[in-house]
Regions:
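Strongly charged
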Residues: 2-5, 17-21, 27-92
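Loop/turn elements at beta-strand to alpha-helix junctions within RNA-recognition modules
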Residues: 12-13
């Protein structure tokens, strides 16, 4: 399944066009490699998302063309969810 579609179906990203725009900016990795919207995702793949200061790592558990909102959480497992702290140097 295409990554942009998977992100929409799993409701990690609410709209496929938004997923495509983020993927075009190189903010996602599949198994450590930069992903494109058309990159294929398979069960067992590890997907890393960098959204602002938020970094989320998930593992794909299941692929489905459509699932109900309540069942979308079953498509992946969150491996890590962290906020990256930004440290600013003081200007004298």
């Amino acid at each position: 399944m295409r990554l942009d579609k998977y992100l929409k179906v799993s409701r990690i990203i609410k709209r496929r066009t938004v997923a495509k725009n983020l993927l075009d900016r190189g903010l996602f990795l599949i198994n450590g490699k930069v992903a494109k919207p058309s990159s294929e995702v398979e069960v067992g793949d590890v997907v890393e998302l960098s959204l602002g200061r938020h970094k989320i790592t998930i593992k794909v558990k299941e692929l489905a063309p459509y699932v109900k909102k309540e069942e979308s959480i079953n498509l992946y497992v969150v491996l890590s969810d962290e906020i990256i702290e930004v440290i600013y140097d003081e200007i004298s």
